[in-house]
Amino acid sequence: MSTPIIPWMGGKRRLADRLIPLFPPHECYVEVFAGGAALYFMRPQAAPVEVLNDINGDLVTLYRVVQNHLEEFVRQFKWALSSRQVFEWQKMTRPETLTDIQRAARFFYLQHHAFAGKVTGQTFGTATTGPAINLLRIEENLSAAWQRLSGTYVENLPWSDCAERYDRAHTFHYMDPPYWQTAGYGVDFPFENYERMADFMRLCKGKVMVSINDHPDIRRVFEGFHFEMVDIRYSTANARQGKTEATGELIIMNWEPAALGGLF
C-alpha cells in the first residue's frame, strides 16, 4: 500500500477504509475517473490487471512521467521553493510550451500548493496545522508510487470509452465522477453523463461502484441499484469564510454486497 501523490478535489483518501472493504472479487481493477487515485494507491493488495484513466491530460502526463522518468522528474525540484510567488508564476506558464517532464512538475507543484486540491480557480493554500510539502524529499516520497505504478495501464480516454474497453465479467470499475452541481474539477460534466453511467451499470458485464454526492437527481437516475451512505466533511473554500461543511457521500453498486462478499 502507498499513498496518493497529489491532493485532489473530492479525493477519497478519508473514505478509503470504508470503501475498500466493499470491493467485490475481481481480476481487473479500473479507476475510470482516476483523479488522485486514492483507492488505487491505498488498497492493501494490487489486482492482477489495473487501469488508471482520466480525461485530464496534465494528470495523465504526471502519472506516466512518475511511472517512467522519476529521476528526471525529481530533478525539476532541486531548487524549488514553496512560495506564493512561484505558485503564481507556475499558473501563468503555458503548459504547451513545456516538455512532458516539465509539464508534470508544474502540475505536481500547483496541486500540492492549491487550496482544496482544485484544478481550476486555484488559489495558494496556506495551513497553520502542518508543514508545507518538503520539495527536497520528493524522490523518497514518490519511490513507493513509482513501484506501485509499475505495470499499470494509464489511459487518457473519455470515461465511457475506458469503461467499455476494459469491461469483462472479471472487471471491477470504480467510478468517482465529478460531483453534480459542483465546480472546480476542470472539466464540464453534463447530467447526461450520469444517465449514461446508470445505463452502463445495467448492461455491463463487470461490477461497478459509483461514489457521488447525495442529491435527489442522482438518486432518481440510479434508482434500483444498491445504495449506501457515508458522511464526509469537505472544505472547498477558505475556512475563515465558514465554508467547511459536512455532506453525504452516496455509494452506488450494481450488485448486492451481502450476497457477493468482499475482496479484502
What is each residue range found by the language model?
Residues M1-L15, L22, A37, Q67-Y174, ...:
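SAM-dependent nucleic-acid methyltransferase catalytic core
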Residues M1-V49, S160-F172, T182-F264:
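Class I S-adenosyl-L-methionine
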Residues P25-Q85:
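Conserved S-adenosyl-L-methionine
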Residues G57, H112, N254-E256:
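Non-catalytic surface loops within mature trypsin-like serine protease
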Residues Y63, Y179, F222:
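Conserved active-site tyrosine of GNAT-family acetyltransferases
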